[in-house]
Amino acid sequence: MSLEMIAVLIFTMGYLLGSVPFGLILARLFGSVDVRQVGSGNIGATNVLRTGRKDLAALTLFFDIGKGALAVLLAHGFSYHLYQQTGCAPDLTLIAGAAAFLGHCYPVWLGFRGGKGVATMLGVSFAAWWVAGVVFAVAWLLSAKISRYSSVGGMVGAIAATISVMFMPASHEIHQVYIALFSGMTILLLWRHRGNIKRLLSGQESRIGDPQ
């Protein structure tokens, strides 16, 4: 099997895993509600919380983080197996993670209308390089707590993780790939938050704890 075919398979696996809309599934199964008809219409944990089900929001957050991490870990396992068989293997782990992030934002099952990718990128960060995951989580929680804006927390976390990757100890080639893919995910994440950014600038963004 050619390297190109392997990369396509890894990307497809990551995308399909990332495109599973756990927020929508959980809200429908246990909350009898279509989360797309609630609040912002987003399928992520923040909007699931607006249904009044903290338990479902927590599960959504867990699974959205998990699918990003799982995509990276599965790709890592495959790369390791390939190395054992052939003596060489490309590092395809972050390609799978970026694909999972893309799948969450643009899931094929929902007409390519998905979430904003914060939790999934957090999972990718933890699995790709745990330091980036810790930086992401701390920056997200602190900025959300200080500003009381969930959107600000997610955006600051993604930017902080991308900056941290610039100091990642790795070969030049792998380092450049990580910087490029983390930067790409962050740019897309910011684009997915463009509505939030407009509301922040106009003073109309909802704060954490505000009634919807």
From Swiss-Prot:
Domain of life, per lineage: Bacteria
InterPro entries, A to Z: G3P_acylTferase_PlsY (IPR003811)
E.C. no: 2.3.1.275
Annotated metabolic or biological route of this protein: Lipid metabolism; phospholipid metabolism
Any matching Pfam family: G3P_acyltransf
Record's catalysed reaction(s): an acyl phosphate + sn-glycerol 3-phosphate = a 1-acyl-sn-glycero-3-phosphate + phosphate
Keyword field: Cell inner membrane, Cell membrane, Lipid biosynthesis, Lipid metabolism, Membrane, Phospholipid biosynthesis, Phospholipid metabolism, Transferase, Transmembrane, Transmembrane helix
GO cellular component: plasma membrane
Location (main, coarse): membrane
Keyword match Membrane: yes
Group of enzyme by EC: transferase
Subunit structure and binding partners: Probably interacts with PlsX.
HAMAP family: PlsY (MF_01043)
Annotated function: Catalyzes the transfer of an acyl group from acyl-phosphate (acyl-PO(4)) to glycerol-3-phosphate (G3P) to form lysophosphatidic acid (LPA). This enzyme utilizes acyl-phosphate as fatty acyl donor, but not acyl-CoA or acyl-ACP.
Family the entry assigns: Belongs to the PlsY family.
Protein name: Glycerol-3-phosphate acyltransferase
